[in-house]
């Protein structure tokens, strides 16, 4: 059993480090993880669930605003992008946050094609991040179920 736990912990460390190296996460995610303790073991997953729910709503709102035969309200799209950027920044979703910067620039320039392209990229990145984090949380659960302790991963 100890060998299994050690293997799962190694997998967890390697996987987590890869999420930072690939740019999915930044230091803000590390700070978020530090807020989790024994009294609130699901804190991070709950915060991320709320983040992903917000992503769905904001992406849907932006898609509706851009899918119009009339005039696009770029200020409305920009406001949603700004909100998504803030949310992604607060949870350490680096790729999503970075895309939001470009998306905001397209809104300010009233660049319809750029906005549509950025929306598609944001949608892809948020879904990829969600899948990656679900995999990470599954590894955490496996470690705990095997009787182990989820290791702290030092990224610096």
UniProtKB/Swiss-Prot annotation:
Subcellular compartments: Cytoplasm, Cytosol; Nucleus
Tissue: Strongly expressed in flowers and roots. Detected also in leaves, siliques and stems.
Keyword Phosphoprotein: yes
Name listed for the protein in its UniProt record: Histidine-containing phosphotransfer protein 2
Induction cue: By salt, cold and drought stress.
Function: Functions as a two-component phosphorelay mediators between cytokinin sensor histidine kinases and response regulator (B-type ARRs). Plays an important role in propagating cytokinin signal transduction through the multistep His-to-Asp phosphorelay.
Native source organism of the sequence: Arabidopsis thaliana
Keywords: Acetylation, Cytokinin signaling pathway, Cytoplasm, Nucleus, Phosphoprotein, Stress response, Two-component regulatory system
GO molecular function: histidine phosphotransfer kinase activity; protein histidine kinase binding
Positions of post-translational N-acetylmethionine modification: 1
UniProt entry tagged with the keyword Acetylation: yes
Top-rank lineage group of the source organism: Eukaryota
UniProt xrefs under InterPro entries: AHP1-5/YPD1, HPT_dom_sf, Sig_transdc_His_kin_Hpt_dom
Main location: cytoplasm
């Amino acid at each position: 059993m100890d060998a299994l736990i050690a293997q799962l912990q190694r997998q967890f460390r390697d996987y987590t480090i890869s999420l930072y190296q690939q740019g999915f996460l930044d230091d803000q995610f590390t700070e978020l993880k530090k807020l989790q303790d024994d009294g609130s073991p699901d804190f991070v997953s709950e915060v991320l669930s709320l983040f992903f729910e917000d992503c769905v709503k904001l992406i849907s709102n932006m898609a509706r605003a851009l899918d119009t035969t009339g005039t696009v309200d770029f200020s409305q799209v920009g406001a949603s992008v700004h909100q998504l950027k803030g949310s992604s920044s607060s949870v350490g979703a680096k790729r999503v946050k970075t895309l939001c910067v470009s998306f905001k620039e397209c809104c300010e320039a009233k660049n319809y094609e750029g906005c549509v392209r950025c929306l598609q990229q944001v949608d892809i990145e948020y879904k990829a991040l969600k899948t990656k984090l679900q995999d990470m949380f599954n590894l955490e659960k496996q470690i705990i179920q095997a009787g182990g302790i989820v290791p702290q991963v030092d990224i610096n």
